[in-house]
Amino acid sequence: MMYRIRNWLVATLLLLCTPVGAATLSDIQVSNGNQQARITLSFIGDPDYAFSHQSKRTVALDIKQTGVIQGLPLLFSGNNLVKAIRSGTPKDAQTLRLVVDLTENGKTEAVKRQNGSNYTVVFTINADVPPPPPPPPVVAKRVETPAVVAPRVSEPARNPFKTESNRTTGVISSNTVTRPAARATANTGDKIIIAIDAGHGGQDPGAIGPGGTREKNVTIAIARKLRTLLNDDPMFKGVLTRDGDYFISVMGRSDVARKQNANFLVSIHADAAPNRSATGASVWVLSNRRANSEMASWLEQHEKQSELLGGAGDVLANSQSDPYLSQAVLDLQFGHSQRVGYDVATSMISQLQRIGEIHKRRPEHASLGVLRSPDIPSVLVETGFISNNSEERLLASDDYQQQLAEAIYKGLRNYFLAHPMQSAPQGATAQTASTVTTPDRTLPN
């Protein structure tokens, strides 16, 4: 259930209300972002409303209206600003109260707009967070030279993280650069290590379907089936970020994958929406905006840079005094992870559409914390809508869970058959930085 960590969620709640006075509440839309959320109330007639902060993490929206709001409570998992929207105790008999629970301290503003006899009130909630650190100084000069490549006949979905002309990038520095190569997995007999992240767990059940099916139980079942498929294939080794009903933080999941020397991470979830007719699977990859913010964070954390996998950690451990090199290496690492993630997501979608409905036919981009690692390419798979009666029954079915695991496995296998992992001796690709050229992707096309 990752409706709360997408770039923006637009959810419609149907309302059955008995109008009192001139205005009737007709619709609610919620856009839930990482640091900002918008709740849009639509009215027929000029509304009478008010809002107040019951605490820094709770906002009460009062509307002159009676009736029953269907679709509440709307529960999010807590990775974005809004944690839940629920009905509250009204202050009088002529008022409805919506209570918005936040994951962080927040501040609220309201703007009313009119369109003929229709009105909207937009409540904008901003997280009360300290300002971000200033951006690092310009630390690298890039010289981009297009290379001539043969046009492709057709592609089902173009990878936006690939340059259209397969560019090479020169990084000018006084140091010597070792290019981060796709890492070998010698300790496991050159197997490709796939970290499988079963979403939620423990006190966090995730989404709960109309029949009571809990997302955390669906995700761990699919994850275990996927691990079995991977471990039965000599190409792979599957490892779980959790193998029981317990909670792991978003950051902790990436750390577990890194400790396992994972080459790729698959996070498994089940979607949910107030619109109970929504169906289908989708696959999500890290957005550029989140990648840029994560890169700035890694540049600040010099002591953690050496933990990065794939050769980048070794390079950065010896470049503490050279911010030019640090940014260049991290930029290459994030770019590589995004490109690989998008291509694997495309491969998975082609398999998922063979077994069921597809909600998004191309990989979607979002600010997802579990996909934040620059050194581990990753995707998040929404296996279907647990909020839909039919898909809830499918997701709870052992047979369909097996089909989902097989689709994810085949997507991984098809990608890595076409793009075998390569290893290189440390320093084998070293060149002087003024002449180094780095291919558009580390894994060959």
Swiss-Prot record:
Region (Disordered): 424-445
Localization: Periplasm
Family annotation (SMART domains): Ami_3 (SM00646)
Signal peptide annotation: 1-22
Enzyme class: hydrolase
GO cellular component, one term: outer membrane-bounded periplasmic space
PANTHER family noted in UniProt: N-ACETYLMURAMOYL-L-ALANINE AMIDASE, N-ACETYLMURAMOYL-L-ALANINE AMIDASE AMIB
Protein's job: Cell-wall hydrolase involved in septum cleavage during cell division. Can also act as powerful autolysin in the presence of murein synthesis inhibitors.
Protein name (database record): N-acetylmuramoyl-L-alanine amidase AmiB
Native organism: Escherichia coli (strain K12)
